[in-house]
């Protein structure tokens, strides 16, 4: 569903990927390169101005503490930074669960604990935290808003929720200077492991533009001044 909102030139998504496997899971294909590349390798090739990382749902487990999750996730993010030091890091909140969901081992309490750990992780490392959960959550129940998760599993976001999420992304920004070096040729992103792209993919000429960072709202949240590499890249996972 993410490719209804982003260009395939600036988004990566892989089924079942986790924050813990961010540095090591090879899932991205590029024209002219054999096999799959890891997220850090992909970011280095795509040379984005910023990345928005959305991981955590696939990490949820009663035996995996919030602090351990954040520690493992941070290692993956640092691998992305090491691969392309000029990139701005934006960590998106884990989306809320539905009040009724198919995997009863997952709890909204744990989602909230993981998100609190992500806030601290970002503060400790100078990264930006995008609190998109606030637009997806029903403040009266603490769960996802009605109609925001699929009725089939109560976990994955609906089109209505994705509309709200991407509106939130576009309207929360904090402008930073583009410090990337001169960009080299960016290879064509041709596929992601276990992901099929439907017919509604957004073209590269109409791609959504993410915020510079996510500390404060700004009326002019769009900036399409990138030349060569994508202005942003979204790394996301799906269960």
Summary of predicted features, one role per range:
Residues 14-16, 49-55, 59, 88-93, ...:
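Structural recognition of the beta-strand scaffold that forms the well-ordered cores
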Residues 84, 93-96:
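Internal catalytic-core helix/loop-beta-alpha segment
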Residues 44, 56, 65, 74, ...:
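Sec-exported extracytoplasmic/periplasmic mature domains
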Residues 96-205, 209, 220, 229-231:
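Catalytic His-Asp segment of secreted/periplasmic serine-dependent ester chemistry enzymes
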Residues 66-76, 110-114:
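Charged helix-capping and loop-helix junction motifs
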Residues 217, 222-228, 233-239:
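Ser/Thr/Pro-rich low-complexity tandem-repeat tracts
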Residues 1-71:
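Conserved SGNH/GDSL esterase-like catalytic core that processes O-acyl groups on lipids
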């Amino acid at each position: 569903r993410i490719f209804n909102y982003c260009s395939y030139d600036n988004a990566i998504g892989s089924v079942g990927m986790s924050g813990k496997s961010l540095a090591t899971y090879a899932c991205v294909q590029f024209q002219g390169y054999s096999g799959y590349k890891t997220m850090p390798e992909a970011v280095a090739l795509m040379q984005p101005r910023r990345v928005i990382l959305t991981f955590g749902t696939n990490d949820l487990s009663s035996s995996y503490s919030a602090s351990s999750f954040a520690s493992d996730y941070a290692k993956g993010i640092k691998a992305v930074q090491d691969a392309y030091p000029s990139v701005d890091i934006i960590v998106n909140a884990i989306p809320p669960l539905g009040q009724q969901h198919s995997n009863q081992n997952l709890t909204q309490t744990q989602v909230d604990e993981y998100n609190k750990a992500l806030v601290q992780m970002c503060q400790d490392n100078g990264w930006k935290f995008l609190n998109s959960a606030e637009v997806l959550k029903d403040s009266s129940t603490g769960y996802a808003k009605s109609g925001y998760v699929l009725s089939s599993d109560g976990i994955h976001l609906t089109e209505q929720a994705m509309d709200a999420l991407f509106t939130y992304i576009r309207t929360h920004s904090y402008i930073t200077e583009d410090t990337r070096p001169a960009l080299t040729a960016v290879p064509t992103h041709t596929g992601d492991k276990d992901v099929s792209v439907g017919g509604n993919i957004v073209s590269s000429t109409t791609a959504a533009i993410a915020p510079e960072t996510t500390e404060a709202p700004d009326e002019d949240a769009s900036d399409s001044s990138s030349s060569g590499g994508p202005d942003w890249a979204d790394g996301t996972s799906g269960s």
